[in-house]
Amino acid sequence: MAESILDRTINRFWYNLGEDCLSESQFDLMIRLMEESLDGDQIIDLTSLPSDNLQVEQVMTTTDDSISEESEFLLAIGETSEDESDSGEEPEFEQVRMDRTGGTEIPKKEDGAEPSRYNERKRKTTEDRYFPTQPKTIPGQKQTSMGILNIDCQTNRRTLIDDWAAEIGLIVKTNREDYLDPETILLLMEHKTSGIAKELIRNTRWNRTTGDIIEQVIDAMYTMFLGLNYSDNKVAEKIDEQEKAKIRMTKLQLCDICYLEEFTCDYEKNMYKTELADFPGYINQYLSKIPIIGEKALTRFRHEANGTSIYSLGFAAKIVKEELSKICALSKKQKKLKKFNKKCCSIGEASVEYGCKKTSKKKYHNKRYKKKYKVYKPYKKKKKFRSGKYFKPKEKKGSKQKYCPKGKKDCRCWISNIEGHYANECPNRQSSEKAHILQQAEKLGLQPIEEPYEGVQEVFILEYKEEEEETSTEESDGSSTSEDSDSD
């Protein structure tokens, strides 16, 4: 009865499995159930299988024996032997009751307490978890299979070609008997490439009679994919690369000592493109470009470097790092000395100074004055209503008062020679004689001069009378000039 129920259980499990996936341990367990023959004392635990797929059909029979067997059926298959039953020892195994709905009941503890729901929600192990997709790679980098050259849309083409060429050369040299024919080597390189590199090897007519076929393919890749004319003029291309490396090493600068690793890496990569005999000069140039510790490191390198270490940039970089660590340790000591109390110096040695004035800096203490806040009074003055506050005031109509200077004037009149008024305000301006004299003086270009002397001053002028008619006209002119002066 147990075997028939087990067979139906396995068939039902595979039917309900559907698109789900099993782990390796679950798959091995199901294979054992299908292939191996079960002994009487063998115990198989099916609790690791998914409970949703493991559904057991219970066969209902009319006999009392079948009902009791199906109601108390255990997934741990096996019966104790007669020897074990005689001894009274019973095997301990986990009992799992099967429900009609197909779910398994959680095994009870020894004390009878039911386990919490925490075990049901327990995180699955790595074996039980299923990854529908592969883990994501670093964005921007195209993953290629091991040993296959694929340089389509790659930025580091030269590095990939060099690594691939080294691998092909190693395969050919370690298996010389298998790769004596150039056709075999080309076939190997064709199967070890993909993309545009494979199309180049397949569609190119190679010279199989002379030269190394591997070197021909690599030079062609340098020409086609890197733009370096290695096929026609390999020596000139290498000389050009050396000149560019020398120019870059000359232009390199290190302004911040924290970028020492990046600077060393760039300098070293370009230095190894030049000749080995020129390495000592480039190493001295490298040390002179390093700030703060470059001079001391250069002195140490000249004294300590000997033999092959003269050509080693790594030895120079090691000296630089040692000097840098010394400076860092010194800076840490200086920070600690700031916190050191000088009063403790008398503990080690007695003072040798008696009556000497100690030089100390004057301490300046800045007093912090608290800002005095004025007492806030929540008092608001009542606003008065102003009718014309936002309007232009009206202009007052009426005659404006003329400016009238007060007090006596301190000027002197030209006509009467009296102080206190101008000539146009003189009451004696109607006198024709003085006006005639002033008119004649103006014609001669004379200007009146005010003298500080008191009293009446007289002005004399010499006149020449030619005809009487002229004098009469001059008198009439004098009267007109007086009128003009009055108008002025």
Swiss-Prot record:
Q: Where are the zinc fingers (CCHC-type)?
A: 411-428
**GO cellular-component term (any):** host cell nucleus
* Keyword Zinc attached: yes
Specify the signal sequence span: none
Compositional bias (Acidic residues) spans?
A: 80-93, 465-488
MF term (GO), any: zinc ion binding
Q: Where in the cell is it found?
A: Virion; Host nucleus
Name the residue ranges with Basic and acidic residues bias.
Answer: 94-130
The record's annotation in InterPro entries points to: Caulimo_coat
Q: Where along the sequence does the record place the motif called Nuclear localization signal? A: 121-124
Q: Which keywords fit this entry according to its UniProt record?
A: Capsid protein, Host nucleus, Metal-binding, T=7 icosahedral capsid protein, Viral penetration into host nucleus, Virion, Virus entry into host cell, Zinc, Zinc-finger
GO terms, biological process: symbiont entry into host cell; viral penetration into host nucleus
Q: Tell me which Pfam families the record gives.
A: Caulimovir_coat_dom
Looking at the keywords, is Zinc present?
A: yes
- Region Disordered, annotated ranges: 79-142, 464-488
Report the function annotation for this chain: Self assembles to form an icosahedral capsid, about 50 nm in diameter, nm, composed of 420 subunits of the viral capsid protein. The capsid encapsulates the genomic dsDNA. Following virus entry into host cell, provides nuclear import of the viral genome. Virus particles do not enter the nucleus, but dock at the nuclear membrane through the interaction with host importins.
Q: Per the similarity annotation, which family is this? A: Belongs to the caulimoviridae capsid protein family.
Q: How does it assemble?
A: Interacts (via nuclear localization signal) with host importin alpha.
Q: What is this protein called?
A: Capsid protein
| Protein species of origin | Cauliflower mosaic virus (strain BBC)
